[in-house]
A protein has these predicted regions:
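Aromatic (phenylalanine/tyrosine) cluster motif
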Residues: 6, 12-13
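A short, conserved acidic/glycine-rich loop-to-beta-strand motif
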Residues: 156-165
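Catalytic-core segments of class I nucleotidyltransferases/pyrophosphorylases
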Residues: 133-134, 141, 147-154, 167-170, ...
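Conserved N-terminal catalytic core of the sugar/cofactor nucleotidyltransferase
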Residues: 21-39, 61, 65-137, 143-148, ...
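A phosphate-binding catalytic loop at a beta-strand-loop-alpha-helix junction
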Residues: 34-51
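Short acidic-glycine loop/turn motifs at beta-strand connectors
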Residues: 177-183
Length: 280
């Protein structure tokens, strides 16, 4: 069977029908092992106060586990090994809990923020990488197969790939469309609004560092706007996996209701049901 090369990645990945010798690592396993991961774990979690006054948001419990514990278990089972935790608020508690990652089968390094750098800012201060970087918010509960978004990034030769989730919400009013002269062109009674939201899951090519200022606050929306202004390829990976950001009290409560029902799924690998990609 022919092999397909994924973007600038030098590894060749076998198709699903290829056979491989016993005990030989699969191409996806190699991809995960060679992909560095950054988890953003430095936020103050102001929307979850007063709980986050004494406990950093990544240590907030979901079921029997801190949310970041669940994420590290998933990454480890999927084959990712090199993890950097970007920490700030109550960083000592996070480091005391996870240490160097040996209990999770990963190697953890810590990047410390003395002043808030936003969501994208910490990337500029990391050592230069030769491979694409998987970046995750540290407060995610999801069943995404992270290897798939990394592979999608290479297949699409992107500079930045954003994990997205489709949301549909009803508009509570009748929606009118009108031209400049007031002429009504359409009237829809309480239509559904369909849109994509960011999952807080990203893959960035090494060159993305060139677009991030050092030592100042810089968020992912700022980075995407700068990339687009410079005609860089930014793509959306649309996922059907379960996803919840626990940053709001209602969502945190929902995550704690969902986790016991799906614990076996959350702590398994290759659990994502489907995903498609869309250019943005």
């Amino acid at each position: 069977m022919p092999r397909q090369k994924f973007g600038e990645e030098r590894q060749y990945f076998e198709s699903a029908n290829d056979t491989k010798p016993m005990n030989k690592p699969s191409p996806m396993t190699i991809l995960c092992e060679q992909t560095p991961v950054v988890i953003l774990a430095g936020g103050k979690g102001t929307r979850l106060m007063p709980y986050t006054t004494a406990l950093p948001k990544p240590l907030m419990p979901v079921g029997e586990y801190p949310i970041l514990d669940i994420l590290l278990r998933q990454l480890s089972k999927q084959g990712f090994r090199r993890i950097t935790l970007a920490v700030g608020h109550l960083a000592g508690l996070i480091q005391a809990y996870f240490k160097q990652g040996q209990d999770w089968g990963v190697e953890i390094e810590y990047a410390y923020e003395t002043t808030p750098l936003g969501t994208a800012g910490p990337i500029a201060r990391l050592p230069r990488q030769e491979r694409a970087l998987l970046v995750l918010n540290g407060d995610l509960l999801t069943t995404m197969d992270f290897a798939k978004i990394v592979r999608f990034h290479y297949e699409n030769r992107a500079v930045a790939t954003i994990g997205t989730k489709r949301r549909t919400e009803p508009v509570q009013f009748g929606v009118i469309e009108a031209g400049p002269n007031g002429q009504i062109t359409d009237y829809k009674e309480k239509p559904n609004l369909d849109y994509l939201v960011s999952m807080g899951i990203y893959v960035f090519a090494p060159t993305v560092r060139e677009y991030i200022p050092r030592s100042q606050k810089f968020d992912f929306p700022d980075l995407v706007q700068r990339l687009l202004a410079n005609q860089q390829r930014v793509v959306a990976y649309e996922s059907e996996a379960y996803w919840m950001d626990i940053g709001r009290p209602d969502d945190y409560q929902q995550a704690n209701e969902d986790f016991p029902k799906m614990e076996g799924i959350f702590l398994k690998t290759n659990v994502e049901s489907a995903a498609v990609g869309t250019r943005i």
